[in-house]
């Protein structure tokens, strides 16, 4: 057996729900703890325990991430009315991801995991496109309402220093009314977004593009453009030049067109709503939503998780004692991306190499023909073309990754 790697500082381990919790347990037992001497602070974010603690456990988990600097999160249920009934919940608890984002702030980076033999819907995407989504403000913190009849819509800003208010005329509504929206962002949050994107690009050694619609929202989107440009010129241009990469602002429509015909290999900084939409479009373009990592990077902490949900349909089969073939790759990458950040904070080169070896083992397994059913369907073109011998079940795939990992670690 390979000697365990000592990890000197702990991480927060956030448990989740349903089938992803099942594979989380397998990942811990077969891919993490046999190889690492690692201390974890565990927080049960399963829906039933969140309900039992009135969601206090989510707040505790977010604060632990702040303190420990690293959180590794399993997918969780965000309850709707049907889930409230199913679990007999006290109330419709908020998304744990939203609570964590509101506590930590930061930027959400979503990156596809590229396997050469998994066909891409956008065939020219040979390298990853990372979406950096500004996870604060805009439509997600907006005030919107229905206007019932004729009237004047105004915006008023009242300075805290007691100086004269500024009033802006927005629209005169006709008698049949309409809808209205007021939204905002802050310089501090935009600056944090910019720093996160520049640092992420430098780390990847990939160019960075910011997309806005500053031709229409001259002041609102213009503020994003100006802040990014100021920080780039002052602090990053020389570093980017040295690394052989660049930063550019592009209009969102131009950027979408460029992305569709590019080969990938860049970081795309998006405002909150744009990032929400484009990250799913990019994920599907690479062929599988099950091959997408997600990290929330704030000024001094990181939370990593899979970009998919709790895989309820597979969990129902698991509950009946039936065989499942659930893709665990994104959940494994949640562990590797979290531990990679821990390794960089601690200057732990052995841990960093372990993370890279585990990621390579996942990809090598798929590229050697060892994969779960969802990927076999992608490779074969349709479910009708897939035989049982074409794929592994949930545990068999993780066992295969463990086998490849041992050989890679032995060779280090």
UniProtKB/Swiss-Prot annotation:
E.C. designation(s): 1.1.1.42
Cofactor stoichiometry and binding remark: Binds 1 Mg(2+) or Mn(2+) ion per subunit.
InterPro entries tied to this protein: IsoCit/isopropylmalate_DH_CS, Isocitrate_DH_NADP, IsoPropMal-DH-like_dom
Critical for catalysis, annotated site positions: 140, 213
The keyword NADP belongs to this UniProt entry's keyword annotation: yes
UniProt xrefs under Pfam families: Iso_dh
GO biological process, one term: 2-oxoglutarate metabolic process
Major location category of this protein: cytoplasm
Binding site for NADP(+): 76-78, 83, 261, 309-314, 327
Positions of substrate binding: 78, 95-101, 110, 133
Keyword Acetylation: no
Catalytic activity reported: D-threo-isocitrate + NADP(+) = 2-oxoglutarate + CO2 + NADPH
Cofactors, names only: Mg(2+); Mn(2+)
Gene Ontology molecular functions: isocitrate dehydrogenase (NADP+) activity; magnesium ion binding; NAD binding
Compartments where found: Cytoplasm
Family label: Belongs to the isocitrate and isopropylmalate dehydrogenases family.
NCBIfam families assigned: nadp_idh_euk, PRK08299.1
Subunit structure: Homodimer.
Protein name: Isocitrate dehydrogenase [NADP] cytoplasmic
Taxonomic source organism: Dictyostelium discoideum (Social amoeba)
